[in-house]
Amino acid sequence: MMRNAQYKMGDGSILNYYEIGTAKDKLLLLHAQGTNSLSFNHVIAKLSKCYHVYLVDYYGHGGSSNNPEKYNLISIGNDMIHFIENVICDSVTVLGHSSGGLIAAYVAAYSDKCTKLILEDPPFFSSWGERRYNTYNYKDLSTACHNFLSQSKEKDFVHYYFVNQYCWNFFPEESRERIREKLGGFALKYREKHPNKNLKVLFWPKKFLEGFNGLQHYDPRFGEAFYNDSFNDGVNYCELLSRIKCKTLFMKAKTTIGENGLLQGALSDEDLQRVKSLIETMEIERFDCGHGIHVERPKQFVQAVVSM
């Protein structure tokens, strides 16, 4: 049975976390931006048979503190190291999905408690500096967060993001606004009736609603940190990655380069090879699916983790 608890940092910040399993080996899971630890529900039961699993909501997500001063890699990374040292109190395999992978890499670079590292499709180099402008995340979630914070009419970010997400650009132009208005109305009604539940929208594919799970507890100011690049906080990723000496697995999802060179995915194959050249101990496993590998390919995902 999964236990939910909170850990209070010395500065009063709260890290909400879940714990399950009694195995000797410890596993720390760090979720993607916009969701929370429960996004791993597809795989947690099987992982907990092999690991004592900890799942932490990092700041701006889930039940953890909303503190914009901590929405950067260094602050979150250092607090995750503190969590490992004071809650897990043991060596640990650290797995991070997407932006959680950036945090996991920081932990592996600066803590000898991290003995194995699993990177689930993190956006190394692509979300850094001017490169970020031509990525799907920047056009989508980051820009939606920035625009939401720049207005005062719309109060509910979940509904705002649904009707302003970048994927509407892939709908036929002649029917786009009609469909957006109709489905946006469904989304608004659901949000008004169920403000604390994961979003459900009639006719919207369940696969794509996964990205909205936990969004009702997301602080859009975290997305602003990716919009203005303050999340990276001047971190030199070449230096950071070269510090990682533990056994490392990189899970690579499919990447598509769209019109005008838009990176529709976390990172390019060139970025991946750059990461590989910096982490000497890294192996790569490719998955024929989108960015959420643990959601789209749960059996293959679990097998890869357990094989570590």
Describe the role of every protein-language-model region.
Residues S13, E19-G63:
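Conserved HGGG/HGGXW glycine-rich cap/lid loop of the alpha/beta-hydrolase fold
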Residues S242-D288:
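Conserved loop-alpha-helix segment in the C-terminal half of the alpha/beta-hydrolase fold
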Residues E174-E239, T255:
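Hydrophobic, aromatic-rich cap/lid helix
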Residues R286-P298:
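Catalytic histidine-centered segment of alpha/beta-hydrolase-like enzymes
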Residues Y58-L95, S99, Y106, E130-R131, ...:
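Active-site loop/oxyanion-hole signature of alpha/beta-hydrolase fold enzymes
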Residues G101-D112, L117:
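Short glycine-enriched nucleophile-adjacent loop
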Residues I118-S175:
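Flexible "cap/lid" loop of the alpha/beta hydrolase fold
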Residues V295-S307:
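Post-His helix in hydrolase/transferase enzymes
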